[in-house]
Amino acid sequence: MVWVEITWANLFHFSPTNMRKSTFLFSLIFLCPFLKSVTAQEASEKPNILYILVDQWRAQATGYSGNQDVLTPNLDQLASESINLKNAISGTPVCTPHRASLMTGQYPLTNGVFMNDVLLDTNAITLPKVFKKDGYNTGYIGKWHLDGHGRNTYIPPTRQQGFAYWKVLECTHNYNNSAYYTGKSDEKKFWNGYDAAAQTEDVLNYLDEQSKSKKPFLLMLSIGSPHAPYHTAPEEFKKHYKNKEIFIHKNVPEELREKVENDTRGYYAHMTAIDSYIGKMRQKLKDLNMDKNTIIVFTSDHGDLLGSHGFYKKQQPYQESIKVPFLIHYPEAFGTKGSISPALINSPDIMPTLLGLSNIDIPETVEGLDFSSVLKGEKKDKVKQTLISCQQPFGQWARKMGGKEYRGVFTGRYTYTRDLEGPWLLFDNVSDPFQMNNLIGKPEHQKLQKTLEKKLNQELQKRNDEFLPGMEYVKKWNYLVDETETVPYINVNYEGKPINE
């Protein structure tokens, strides 16, 4: 039983004149249905979230960013109705570290995930766990790359980090008829045809089901392309680029330009395919009348050098590697008039920003910044720099290939980094967008270099980052690495050790 003191005027909105106050005793039998309906209403007012994460899509490769070669009409339309965070970066530009920061809101030296193919702590407070606790349905489709038990192994529910709906493979770069596992079954299944197309169909089915639910949802779609191999998109998209002359970045060495142009055709074909699927997902949300209260995020885990500075793939601090597309579409909060934001959003900032937009308390474990008030225009953006880093080079940028540890700051206009030996790179990204003129050590830029060094030290102090040699962190976290200081992922058992054959 519960006592509630009200007046007839409050109950029926009558004038209080000549009415005397009355006290009523309401039983919980009467009140509970009312309270439940309020809870359901509040839940329905929470935004849905469709988070589209692609792999290795650099920021410069969209029509809306000014690229006249790649065909991305659906993304261009989405950008015209969204906030385009033009300075979004992947602070540790490689797959697993970005995904761990996305899930935890933490920097790599806090969650321990600073290399590929290591396990994100199953006890971590993660994005899906927080949303699930707040009443959300949670789902994940596609590439995971946070399990650390080899790339083809079944991931049991205890390592699914709070996602209820689950169609996932740890990692593959075969984008046609690749394998996946569902939530509680170790039976290997296969996507039908091109993975991104089949996964999109699964998203559409999920949205149909969620339209019948009173709960909001968080659905993450993680697409493996346009990461290499570049030439495996469906023919209907490859034909757009056949024999097409492609603009190649000026920082690509002459000896690589023919290869890079050919690879870029395939890279763009993957993108145009994905773009078409994004159009389907948007149309489904509109058909279900869910578009206005659904936050759509489109972004990538990192970029792709694709020949720039003589390298492919990522890890390095150049623009093509660290800068990622980042569109956030939320009509109920932002309207549908597109805008461009200079906010320096980094990988750990995504979780708190989504929580802020969803009016969910941010856990104390989160280190990233909540940009929701900035995006809504309620606060001024006071962030002047953000941290970029490589804690331990490995794989395609192992030491024998020139890989090295670095720490740096990105301010939008400037990129500054130092390695273990001292200042390494300084670029003015406005006057030198392809970063071909290193300003380190030039007398006329000494004041700028000192200012950026001070900013870097401030960021390192915030993170308690001592900037040690990479193997010190490998030993601290007890990771097993091979002769190239890379975590092995082929023939690995559940303790993370290679299987002796």
Question: Could you say what each language-model-derived stretch is?
Answer:
Residues 465-481:
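Short, charged, surface-exposed hinge/linker loops at domain edges
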